[in-house]
Swiss-Prot record:
Binding site for substrate: N89, M90, E91
One GO CC term on file: cytosol
Gene Ontology biological process terms in this record: cytidine deamination; deoxycytidine catabolic process; nucleobase-containing small molecule interconversion
Segments traversing the membrane: none
Cofactor note: Binds 1 zinc ion.
Enzyme class, UniProt record, top EC level: hydrolase
GO MF terms, alphabetically ordered: cytidine deaminase activity; identical protein binding; protein homodimerization activity; pyrimidine nucleoside binding; zinc ion binding
Protein name, entry field: Cytidine deaminase
Domain remark in the UniProt entry: Each monomer is composed of a small N-terminal alpha-helical domain and two larger core domains that have nearly identical tertiary structures and are related by approximate two-fold symmetry, but lack homology.
Binding of Zn(2+), residues: H102, C129, C132
Subunit field text: Homodimer.
InterPro entries named among the record's database cross-references: APOBEC/CMP_deaminase_Zn-bd, CMP_dCMP_dom, Cyd/dCyd_deaminase_Zn-bd, Cyt/Deoxycyt_deaminase, Cyt_deam_dimer, Cytidine_deaminase-like, Cytidine_deaminase_bacteria
Length: 294
């Protein structure tokens, strides 16, 4: 079991501990539960889906990286496939506050970058901030997304974001988590190709500036993140954050990164290079390359 889970695990009910123990035994537990695993946990504990998601939130929050606030938020995104994806907030010392990742963004990106097609619900241990409510409004599940909070009745996103402004107001038809492929040729080594593939999946209907980041760890594992724009612009999630979300949730740490590649267009209206390289250097990675999409 990864050490970060030990404290939260010890506080779970005995029957949930017993059912989870073989799942969490792997140090690199992927911070997700398949539909089959969810069903097994429900049977072992007698909990329904909502109660089980609430019970698992401490494990999701244990994935938080909060050296600035020490305020850990956990989220679980429930995919229409039946898979549940953990998420947690992340802060980066030495970077800017704008690079911060919120727990809801983490769980949603985890699902999206894992190939999930849409979300049915998201469970969070604290009320989503306005930033996250706007981020969620970019999803193809839209205002129908169900939000579950401890001690409250579940409500749709529309109840948390009345009179919402979103992609439909800008006549955007392709939404976040819809399948997208921008068709750039995969060239270069494996890490470069992973970055280009991530750029091909970008959701960037507002700037037309595709980008992707791939991080290579010392053991050869590669984590890729795609750019995810938002109709309100500021809640946009950069591609580096997508890759860092996966790296963190899969049990790796920043010192494990040995090389990074950013893929983007040289003449794009928005450029990720400066922010990406600055944040990576703050995390201790200095081997950073850029490949140009063509």
């Amino acid at each position: 079991m990864h050490p970060r889970f030990q404290t939260a695990f010890a506080q779970l009910a005995d029957n949930l501990q017993s059912a989870l123990e073989p799942i969490l035994a792997d140090k690199y537990f992927p911070a997700l539960l398949t539909g089959e695993q969810v069903s097994s946990l429900k049977s072992a504990t007698g909990l329904d889906e909502d109660a089980l998601a609430f019970a698992l939130l401490p494990l999701a929050a244990a994935c938080a990286r909060t050296p600035l606030s020490n305020f850990n938020v956990g989220a679980i995104a429930r995919g229409v496939s039946g898979t549940w994806y953990f998420g947690a907030n992340m802060e980066f010392i030495g970077a800017t506050m704008q690079q911060t990742v919120h727990a809801e963004q983490s769980a949603i990106s985890h699902a999206w970058l894992s190939g999930e097609k849409a979300l049915a619900a998201i469970t969070v241990n604290y009320t989503p901030c306005g930033h996250c409510r706007q981020f969620m409004n970019e999803l193809n599940s839209g205002l129908d997304l169900r939000i579950h909070l401890p001690g409250r009745e579940a409500h749709a996103l529309r109840d948390y974001l009345p009179d919402a402004f979103g992609p439909k107001d800008l006549e955007i038809k392709t939404l976040l988590m819809d399948e997208q492929d921008h068709g750039y040729a995969l060239t270069g080594d494996a890490l470069s190709q992973a970055a280009i593939a991530a750029a091909n999946r970008s959701h960037m209907p507002y700037s037309k500036s595709p980008s992707g980041v791939a991080l290579e760890c010392k053991d050869g594992r590669i984590f890729s993140g795609s750019y995810a724009e938002n109709a309100a612009f500021n809640p946009t999630l950069p591609p580096l954050q997508g890759a860092l979300i996966l790296l963190n949730l899969k049990g790796y740490d920043y010192p494990d990164i040995q090389r990074a590649v950013l893929a983007e267009k040289a003449d794009a209206p928005l450029i990720q290079w400066d922010a990406t390289s600055a944040t990576l250097k703050a995390l201790g990675c200095h081997s950073i390359d850029r490949v140009l999409l063509a």
